[in-house]
């Protein structure tokens, strides 16, 4: 099959690209403005393949300054987008530890004692202290609270309604077609295969779609982006060592909650100092609330779902949500290297946009608006190339797209933020000092630190729990958990002092039950497993198995002899397993022992 332009992935970046491009393909009278080189006489042929089973499935809620979005939609009315609201108020809370179980550094414990002693003066309430101001670099005043799933569906409807673009959900892309040092299209995944990928009944080989330009927007864990990194390399000094899992609940707020739509709450300090929280209020008494668990949180038993429940039970959060109902939930890997994670942005026949192109601002904690704007800039460059009847060569794309990006606010702000997170390699306090220094000096000062691949910094369970749980107890918990086919984090956390979660079946539900809520997690038959354990014996002898602990959907679990096993029916496609591994790949010191391929299924909710 032939096309002119093929896009991989439909997220904010593709949304910006296709919105801008589609507006220029036809004239106002409906006649063709840009003719297709591959199908003369027809308008430009543009296809977009999305892995998830529908548009907007499996992405997240967000607060954004909406700088780029408002350029694309100058008359934007948030009320036309489900779950959207203007930012009405914003505050930053430092959460004290109400249960005494978090692993806080000594200086933070001293500070906590002082804060409690001066609670009346500092306005401490519900074991939380509101900071007197939100740092300017985090301030989202004038922005929007969005459900990106709902926003993507809204954008997709407009793009497809133009009649100039085809978007195909439930269409994972297996690989880019690389020929003669360039990309000439994509190949979709095989269907009708066993979990091992072998042909079965109704086998259908993946279709080749050839195009003059392939736009890669498959996110930070996308297999096509990683394929191009391997094929063409990344700029010297660039890396993708810093990651986080963002996990959130979508909650129906109780009648007692008086938070107005557009309220934004940021938190730090609990359940562990390294974990940051967010609380965004949508219209109609709905809220998105969740946490970010970073790769520099050196716990081999880190589990976002369990920590999210403990965070929600903090008195400062619980008072707003008690009596509410969990509607749905979701999780996503976030590329936290920012501009230093930027790959090669363009080559012969291809261009990279979005989070996987290093657009996330790691100082302002924002990525949606930046991703959208990279898509807009590529579309503007593509239209320039088409107008001049030039081919999509690396040279032409560099001139029309990359140079445009280098002059943009995305680039300028990204350079300011580039070193903002380095201090976290030294600990939470140096990290916070470094972020403040970077923000206040516009990038002139920062706390030095050298990010390392996650597998090089994760300690063993025995090292992490030294002084709190004996090695003998850890071994007992490990064996008992393996025998039951479950992860160890729940037993380890309770043994370390964390209280059991008081499940109520409404707001506090078990991880297993959450898989059935809202957009039920499911996977269609006839596709191969997309998680592969490259060296099973090494996985079997691994003492920590952080891939099991961190799995957002319990899709990775202890199998035979404790070896990690994978259940595609539970996978939410967050990609956490790609960077949560305790052992280095013998063939690539930057990688772990897990490969994450193109796959179907996952979350079935456009709220997440």
Feature-to-residue mapping (PLM):
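N-terminal Rossmann-like FAD-binding beta1-loop-alpha1 element of flavoenzymes
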Residues: 2-47
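Short FAD-binding loop at a beta-strand-to-alpha-helix junction that anchors the flavin cofactor
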Residues: 283-285, 344-363
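Active-site-proximal substrate-binding core of FAD-dependent oxidoreductases
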Residues: 39-43, 358-364, 370, 376, ...
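N-terminal FAD cofactor-binding segment of flavoenzymes
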Residues: 20, 24, 39-120
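Helix-loop-beta segment of a Rossmann-like dinucleotide-binding subdomain
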Residues: 121-153, 157, 292-294
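Ferredoxin-type iron-sulfur electron-transfer modules and their immediate structural context
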Residues: 82-85, 93-96, 122-123, 410-560, ...
């Amino acid at each position: 099959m032939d096309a002119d332009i093929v896009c991989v992935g439909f997220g904010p970046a593709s949304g910006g690209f296709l919105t801008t491009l589609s507006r220029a393909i036809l004239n106002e009278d409906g006649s063709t403005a840009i003719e297709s080189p591959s199908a003369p006489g027809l308008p430009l042929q543009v296809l977009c393949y999305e892995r998830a089973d529908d548009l907007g499935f499996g992405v997240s809620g967000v607060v954004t300054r909406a700088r780029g979005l408002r350029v694309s939609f100058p008359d934007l009315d948030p009320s036309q987008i489900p779950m959207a609201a203007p930012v009405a108020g914003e505050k930053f809370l430092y959460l004290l530890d109400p249960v005494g179980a978090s692993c806080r550094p000594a200086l933070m414990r001293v500070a906590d004692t002082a804060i409690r002693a001066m609670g009346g003066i500092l306005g401490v309430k519900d074991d939380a202290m509101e900071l007197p101001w939100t740092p300017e670099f985090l301030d989202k005043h004038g922005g929007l609270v969005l459900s990106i799933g709902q926003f993507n569906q809204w954008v997709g409807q407009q793009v497809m309604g133009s009649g100039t673009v085809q978007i195909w959900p439930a269409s994972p892309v297996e690989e880019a077609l690389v020929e003669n040092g360039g990309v000439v299209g994509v190949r979709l995944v095989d269907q009708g295969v066993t979990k091992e990928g072998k042909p079965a009944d109704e086998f259908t080989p993946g279709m080749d779609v050839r195009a003059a330009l392939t736009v890669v927007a498959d996110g930070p864990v996308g297999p096509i982006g990683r394929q191009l990194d391997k094929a063409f390399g990344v700029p010297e000094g660039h890396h993708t060592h810093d990651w986080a899992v963002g996990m959130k609940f979508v909650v129906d707020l109780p009648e007692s909650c008086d938070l107005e739509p557009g309220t934004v709450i940021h938190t730090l300090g609990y359940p562990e100092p390294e974990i940051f929280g967010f609380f965004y209020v949508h219209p109609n008494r709905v809220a998105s609330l969740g946490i970010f668990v970073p790769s520099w949180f050196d716990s081999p038993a880190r589990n976002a779902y369990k920590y999210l429940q403990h965070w929600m039970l903090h008195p400062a959060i619980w008072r707003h949500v008690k009596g509410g109902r969990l509607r749905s939930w979701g999780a996503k890997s976030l590329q936290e290297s920012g501009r230093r994670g930027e790959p090669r942005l363009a080559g012969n026949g291809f261009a990279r946009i979005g989070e996987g192109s290093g657009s996330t601002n790691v100082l302002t904690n924002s990525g949606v608006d930046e991703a959208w704007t990279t898509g807009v800039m590529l579309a503007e460059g593509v239209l320039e190339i088409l107008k001049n009847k030039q081919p999509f060569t690396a040279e032409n794309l560099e001139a029309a797209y990359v140079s445009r990006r280098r002059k943009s606010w995305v680039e300028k702000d990204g350079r300011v933020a580039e070193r903002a997170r380095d201090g976290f390699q030294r600990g939470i306090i140096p990290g916070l000092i470094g972020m403040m220094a970077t923000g206040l000096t516009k990038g002139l000062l920062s706390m030095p630190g050298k990010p390392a691949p996650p597998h090089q910094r994760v300690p063993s369970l025995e090292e992490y729990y030294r002084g709190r749980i004996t090695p003998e107890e850890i071994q007992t918990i490990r064996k008992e958990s393996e025998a039951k086919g479950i992860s160890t984090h729940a037993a380890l956390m309770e043994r370390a002092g964390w209280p059991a979660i008081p499940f109520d079946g409404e707001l506090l539900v078990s991880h297993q039950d959450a898989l059935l809520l809202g957009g039920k997690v499911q996977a269609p038959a006839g596709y191969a497993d997309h998680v592969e354990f490259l060296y099973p014996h090494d996985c079997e002898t691994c003492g920590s198995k952080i891939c099991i602990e961190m799995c957002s959907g319990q899709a990775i679990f202890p199998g035979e002899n404790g070896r990690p096993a994978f259940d595609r029916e539970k996978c939410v496609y967050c990609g956490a397993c790609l960077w949560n591994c305790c052992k280095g790949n013998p063939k690539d010191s930057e990688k772990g022992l897990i490969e994450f391929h193109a796959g179907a299924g996952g979350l079935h909710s456009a709220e997440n």
